[in-house]
UniProtKB/Swiss-Prot annotation:
InterPro entries: AminoTfrase-like_pln_mobile, MAIN-like. A motif (Nuclear localization signal) lies at residues 464-468. Required for the organization of the root apical meristem (RAM) and the shoot apical meristem (SAM). Required to maintain genome stability and cell division activity in meristematic cells. Signal peptide: none annotated. GO terms for cellular component: nucleus. It comes from Arabidopsis thaliana. It holds the Pfam family PMD. GO terms for molecular function: transaminase activity. Disruption phenotype: Developmental defects, such as short roots, misshaped leaves, reduced fertility and partial fasciation of stems. This is Protein MAINTENANCE OF MERISTEMS.
Length: 478
């Protein structure tokens, strides 16, 4: 079996034939986190639950075009980026340094009280019933923010706990576990925060990485147009490692994501092609393989103690997610020589997702228990990676950029119109002023008329139906 056995499903197979999907819609939602006003008592509970450092990261402006270009290089067969200079990935140690989340501890397995209705879970752990705001086992993020963003003065300890749990499920549902529909957040997460001290025993960073791996993997498929997960982690990882549109660093602080919290430049969707070309031209001199060495002096000792787990070949566990962590494919990120890596186990057929999940969780838990026993050592070699690079170039797709032509430009415009038409079809216009609603309806009509040229209207209708069906399948795997 070839290493990249899903090439026909991968977005690169579409790009290389001139089929552009455009820039991904990035669904991490951090822009409203500043509305939450935490008291000292709440901050103490947040710290106890393991999110004391992470809450400091807050909102970082996302570069959707850069994220889209990176996703085009991701291969879910190996959970690595395939760059011209070799494979790279986001490793456990990097999660802890960038986000300030623990990567050692109990696995974060999605839990649910089987005999307890989601509304009763909310009543018991939030003190309120989300009337009209609950869909299945998911509550609206809007209701959480409006009901719990500010803890009243003189609140009892019980009320403080309610408001803190609401904040915690809001922040995980908007960031590390953000799905392709972050407007709704799973009530199941409340169970994880029922006891704040026990919550602090979980490996939240490992769960965040498992979830991000799954989201990038899904988004790397040619049929997808949306991505969730902690995209702040992905973007900051790129800034540390790759000299591509890297902003100036700000004040040195921990978590290290704060180094990139400065003002970002305005960007265009055309930047996707610029970034794609830059990644095509990437050579080792433009890669910072070990970028954190100069900042370790500001890292708390509790995080330094677990940096070794970055080299653990293990299974990562998150809510309803199991993903392999393969540092042996990215040894240059640890200052070691890269040799031809061993084979990776094939992904399971997601059609049997429900049947396989329990088995996956059980075997993954056993693997995670041995995480310190499976530390990858130097694979050997004398510093000469020519044999590895020869092998790598024979199994991958090294370049994606295509020289643009008038025909390609027209296709890109049509792709943008298609994307607008698909987004517009999901919008609710009921709450808008009549003049605003009329203006938007006219714009949508103009776009739809433009698509009637040639076969694009039929393509739009077919694409929307196909993506809805495939997105439903993807949601099962989130």
């Amino acid at each position: 079996m070839p290493v990249l056995y899903e090439q026909d499903k991968h977005v690169s197979s579409a790009i290389l034939t001139g089929q552009e999907r455009g820039v991904l819609r990035c669904q991490e939602r951090t822009s409203l986190l500043h509305h939450w006003k935490l008291t000292k008592e709440q901050i103490a509970l947040v710290e106890k639950a393991g999110f004391g450092w992470f809450r400091l990261v807050g909102s970082i402006s996302l570069n959707n075009s850069l994220i889209s270009a990176l996703v085009e290089r991701w291969r879910r067969e190996t959970n690595t980026f395939h760059f011209p200079c070799g494979e790279m990935t986001i490793t456990l140690d990097e999660v802890s340094l960038i986000l300030g989340l623990a990567v050692d501890g109990k696995p974060v397995v999605g839990v649910k009280e089987k005999d307890e209705d989601p509304s009763q879970v909310c009543l018991r752990l939030l003190g309120k019933l989300p009337k009209g705001e609950l869909s299945g086992n998911r509550v609206t993020a809007k209701w959480l923010k409006e009901s719990f963003a500010e803890c009243p003065k003189g609140a009892t300890m019980k009320e403080i706990e309610y408001h803190t749990r609401a904040y915690l499920i809001y922040i995980v549902g908007s960031t590390i576990f953000a799905t392709t529909d972050p407007s709704k957040i799973s009530v199941d997460y409340l169970i994880l925060f029922e006891d704040f001290e026990k919550a602090g025993e979980y490996a939240w960073g490992a769960a965040a990485l498992a979830f991000l791996y799954r989201q990038i993997g899904n988004a790397s498929q040619r049929s997808q147009s949306i991505i969730g997960g902690c995209l702040t982690l992905l973007q900051c990882w790129s800034y540390f490692h790759l000299n591509i549109d890297r902003p100036k660093r700000t004040t040195r602080q921990f978590p290290l994501a704060l180094l990139w919290k400065g003002r970002q430049q305005s960007r265009s969707k055309n930047d996707l092609f610029k970034y794609r070309k830059a990644l095509d031209d990437l050579d080792p001199s433009n890669v910072s393989w070990c970028p954190f060495e100069g900042d370790l002096d500001i890292v708390p000792q509790s995080f330094k103690d677990n940096l070794l787990l970055g080299r653990s070949r293990t299974k990562l566990i998150g809510p309803k997610v199991v993903e392999w962590h393969f540092p042996d494919r990215c040894m240059k990120q640890f200052g070691l020589c890269q040799v031809i890596p061993g084979e990776v186990p094939p992904r399971k057929n997601e059609k049997n997702h429900d049947e396989d999940l329990l088995e996956d969780m059980n075997t993954a838990d056993e693997e995670w228990m041995r995480r310190r026993e499976n530390i990858v050592e130097n694979g050997g070699g004398n510093g000469d990676e020519s044999e590895y690079m020869q092998w790598f170039n024979s199994i991958t797709v090294p370049k994606l950029h295509r020289d643009t032509s008038l025909e390609a430009d027209i296709m890109n415009v049509q792709a943008a119109i298609l994307q607008f038409d698909e987004v517009a079809s999901t919008l609710s216009l009921e709450d808008l002023h009549p003049e605003e609603r009329e203006a938007i309806e006219e714009a949508v009509m103009s776009m739809s008329n433009a698509l009637r040229v040639g076969d694009w209207y039929e393509a739009s209708t077919t694409n929307k139906r196909k993506r809805r069906e495939e997105q439903q399948q993807t949601d099962w795997s989130e």
